[in-house]
Swiss-Prot record:
Pfam families linked to this entry: ABC2_membrane, ABC2_membrane_7, ABC_tran
GO cellular component: cytoplasmic vesicle membrane; plasma membrane
Keywords, comma-separated and alphabetical: ATP-binding, Glycoprotein, Membrane, Nucleotide-binding, Pigment, Transmembrane, Transmembrane helix, Transport
UniProt-recorded name of the protein: Protein white
Biased composition (Polar residues): 15-32
Family recorded in the similarity comment: Belongs to the ABC transporter superfamily. ABCG family. Eye pigment precursor importer (TC 3.A.1.204) subfamily.
Membrane-spanning intervals of the chain: 457-475, 487-507, 537-555, 564-585, 598-616, 681-700
Record region (Disordered): 1-35
Main function: May be part of a membrane-spanning permease system necessary for the transport of pigment precursors into pigment cells responsible for eye color.
Family annotation (NCBIfam families): 3a01204
Glycosylation site residues: 485, 658
Annotated PANTHER family: ABC TRANSPORTER G FAMILY MEMBER 28 (PTHR48041), PROTEIN WHITE (PTHR48041:SF129)
Compartments reported by the entry: Membrane
Amino acid sequence: MTINTDDQYADGESKTTISSNRRYSTSSFQDQSMEDDGINATLTNDKATLIQVWRPKSYGSVKGQIPAQDRLTYTWREIDVFGQAAIDGKSREPLCSRLRHCFTRQRLVKDFNPRKHLLKNVTGVARSGELLAVMGSSGAGKTTLLNELAFRSPPGVKISPNAIRTLNGVPVTAEQMRARCAYVQQDDLFIPSLTTKEHLMFQAMLRMGRDVPATPIKMHRVDEVLQELSLVKCADTIIGVAGRVKGLSGGERKRTAFRSETLTDPHLLLCDEPTSSLDSFMAQSVLQVLKGMAMKGKTIILTIHQPSSELYCLFDRILLVAEGVAFLGSPYQSADFFSQLGIPCPPNYNPADFYVQMLAIAPNKETECRETIKKICDSFAVSPIARDIIETASQVNGDGGIELTRTKHTTDPYFLQPMEGVDSTGYRASWWTQFYCILWRSWLSVLKDPMLVKVRLLQTAMVASLIGSIYFGQVLDQDGVMNINGSLFLFLTNMTFQNVFAVINVFSAELPVFLREKRSRLYRVDTYFLGKTIAELPLFIAVPFVFTSITYPMIGLKAAISHYLTTLFIVTLVANVSTSFGYLISCASSSISMALSVGPPVVIPFLIFGGFFLNSASVPAYFKYLSYLSWFRYANEALLINQWADHRDGEIGCTRANVTCPASGEIILETFNFRVEDFALDIGCLFALIVLFRLGALFCLWLRSRSKE
C-alpha cells in the first residue's frame, strides 16, 4: 500500500487527500469507581490497629488518588541507541583496564558499528494519569526503548550522550529512577522451588521500605495482591520451571512477575509485554489493573504486541516505534493521522494490527516497506502533533516549566533526595533484613527438595560402605600401613569431588535471578552470598559425618573417640574447603557447562600436591607457591598425624622379610616429610583456605554484578 502525496503542505511535505471520521469508543473505566488502595483495618486486635494507623504516602487521599504535587511526568528527548560491536569481536582494553573500570564504575568504551542504529532520535512524553502503549513490529525497538527509559541498557548497547531523561523537569540518574520506578521485564525469572506466596513475601520484605513499620502489614499487602490478579488458588503452588518442573502456568507466572514489581504501588511503572503468555481474559485483567493505576495519577508505560481491539480501547496514548517515532498520540489522533496519509484503517479492523502491519518489514519487500516507514516517520515529524510533543517536552525540560511540580521541588527537591524507606545506597531493606530474607529463601529451597538431600546422604552412605568394605579390618603391619594411608587419602578425594561438583552450579544456575534482583537494589552482593552459602552449610556438615562414621570403624582406624572426632573434624573442614572452591568456580564461570569443564583440570594439580602421589619435598620450585593452596596437603598431613603420631616402636608388626618396615608412627610421617608439630598449622591453613576461596568467590560474584550495571 502506498501513501497519497498528490497535495503538498506549505513546507513541501506530503499532505493527504483522505480524511477519516473513524472514532473509537472510550473505556468503561471512565465510569469505574475508585477503590481505596490503602490498607484497611481487616485484622483483629493489635494487627488491626497497626494496619489502620499506617498508610503509605503513595496511596494519597482516601480514594487512592495521588496528590498533584506527587505526580510524575516523564519526558525523554533525542534517544539514540546503538548496538555495540568491538573491532574483530575483541575489546580493545586489556583485562587490567577492564577490572579498573569495575572499581571506578566507568563503562567500557568500545567501537560502535554505525550500521547498528537501534533507535533514532526518539522524543516523547508520558504524563501522569495516562496509560501509554508502545507498539511496533518485532525488532522495532520497543524493549530497547523501555530499557533506556528505565536506565537498564543491556551489555552491547550504548545510548547517545545527548539523550535527556527527566522527571517533572529534573534530570534523573539511574539510582534515582530505581527508587521511583518499577520495571516489569518480559522474561519471568524466579527461584523455581518457591511457591507464589513465598516469592511475594520475599519481594515484599525487600521492596517495601523501612517506612513500612511492621511485617504484618507487608504480609497483608501480599494477600491483597494475590486477590487482585486471581492468584489465591495458586498461592501455595511452587513456581516450577516451564517444561521441566511442574508448577505455575505461563499466565500465572506472568501475573506473579507483574505483582512482584507493583507491591510498593510505584508512581512510575514500566512494563515490557505484560500480557504475553496470557489468555484474552487475563490480559484484559492485567491491563484493567494498569488502567486503574493510571486513573489514580500514576504514569504507566508499557510495550505490547498486537493487542486486541478491546485492549486497544484502554490506551490513553500510543507510541508507534519503527526504529524512530512513527506516531505518538491518542487513538483518535492516530486514526486521523493515518487517514490523512491515505492509509486509513479499514472498517471493522483492529487498529493495532493495522498499524503494526504498516510498520513491519515484509519478506521480499524490504525496500518498499522501508520507504513507506520513512514517509510515515517523516510525515509525523512535521505534523502538528509532533510539534506539540516537542514543545511540551521542552517546557517540561525547563524552558517553560510546570509550575505545580517545580515550585515544590524548588523548596524540597524530591527527586534529589532519597525516597522514603531507601538508604543512601538505594536499598530499601537494612543489611540484616536482606541477609535474613536471602537465608530464609535459600533454606526453603533446600527444604523444598528433600529428595536431593536424601540422594546426597544415600550416595555418601553407599560410597562410604564400599570404601569400608574394600579396606575392611586393617591390621598394623606393612600392608596395613599402606592401606590405611591410601584410605585416608581417599577420604579427602571423595569429599573434594563430591562437594565441588555438588555446588559448582549453585551460583551459575541462579545468576540471571541474582543479576536482576541486584539491579533492582533488592539486596547487596555480600548478603546474597552469605545467605546462600550459610543455608547450605548444614548439608556439608552432615555429609562428612555420615561418611566418616561409616568408614572409620569398618577400616579399623585408631580406636579412640578423640581420634575419631579429630578425623571427623578434619574431613568436615575438607568438605567445606572443597565447597568453597566449588563456589569460586561457580562464581567465576559464565555458565554451568563452563563450570563443569573447568572443575576437574583445576582440582587435579591440588590433588597431586597432597603428598600421597608426590612427596611434599619433591614439589618443583616453580610450583611451590601453588602447592600452598592445596587443601589435600594440609588435610593429609593432619589425618596421618592423628593416625600415627602415638604409635611407638614395636606397635607395628613387621611380617615380611627383606621389606622396609616402618616400625613406628614417626617413621611413617618422616616418609611423607610430615612433622607432628605442624598439626596446628595444618588446621589453621584449612580454615584460611575456606576464607580465601569464599572471598575469591564473593569478589568474582561482585565483578559479575558490576559488569552488568
